[in-house]
Amino acid sequence: MRVLVQRVSSAAVRVDGRVVGAIRPDGQGLVAFVGVTHGDDLDKARRLAEKLWNLRVLAGEKSASDMHAPILVISQFTLYADTAKGRRPSWNAAAPGAVAQPLIAAFAAALRQLGAHVEAGVFGAHMQVELVNDGPVTVMLEG
């Protein structure tokens, strides 16, 4: 499982022109782009959620937990693109939707159980994601 994290001052995700998730924190929040690969499981999703919740990437070396910062979760299978051969990426390392969808939902649920305010995109949908990266700060978590 890979989670590409961006510290933001605001973010929104639209599907078919309609906002389906948005965060507008008083200070900073996080956008988590989540990719799932073969062999990922619920334990991995929970561990990465806890790592994200406690990751000290907000102002003053604070975590989302410290600041009660909101998190926008977006599924993104392209985090497992393989560009080693040719000019067209392979997606073979990305788990199929039937595996990935429940694990991304479990990741978001684990964040909520930890106390996070979580917004989310729509799994499998074509989404337009708008965000204002603050810093910029972008970190890759892998588990």
From Swiss-Prot:
GO BP terms: D-amino acid catabolic process
Keyword set includes Cytoplasm: yes
InterPro entries for this protein: Daa-tRNA_deacyls_DTD, DTD-like_sf
Renumbered ranges of motif Gly-cisPro motif, important for rejection of L-amino acids: 135-136
Reaction equations catalysed: glycyl-tRNA(Ala) + H2O = tRNA(Ala) + glycine + H(+); a D-aminoacyl-tRNA + H2O = a tRNA + a D-alpha-amino acid + H(+)
Pfam families: Tyr_Deacylase
UniProt subcellular location: Cytoplasm
GO CC annotation: cytoplasm
The protein's enzyme class: hydrolase
Primary residence: cytoplasm
EC number assigned by the record: 3.1.1.96
Key words of the record: Cytoplasm, Hydrolase, RNA-binding, tRNA-binding
GO molecular function: D-tyrosyl-tRNA(Tyr) deacylase activity; Gly-tRNA(Ala) deacylase activity; Ser(Gly)-tRNA(Ala) hydrolase activity; tRNA binding
The protein's assembly and partners: Homodimer.
Domain remark from Swiss-Prot or TrEMBL: A Gly-cisPro motif from one monomer fits into the active site of the other monomer to allow specific chiral rejection of L-amino acids.
Protein family according to the UniProt entry: Belongs to the DTD family.
Biological role stated in the UniProt entry: An aminoacyl-tRNA editing enzyme that deacylates mischarged D-aminoacyl-tRNAs. Also deacylates mischarged glycyl-tRNA(Ala), protecting cells against glycine mischarging by AlaRS. Acts via tRNA-based rather than protein-based catalysis; rejects L-amino acids rather than detecting D-amino acids in the active site. By recycling D-aminoacyl-tRNA to D-amino acids and free tRNA molecules, this enzyme counteracts the toxicity associated with the formation of D-aminoacyl-tRNA entities in vivo and helps enforce protein L-homochirality.
Protein name (record): D-aminoacyl-tRNA deacylase
Organism: Mycobacterium bovis (strain BCG / Pasteur 1173P2)
Taxonomic path: Bacteria, Bacillati, Actinomycetota, Actinomycetes, Mycobacteriales
Gene label: dtd
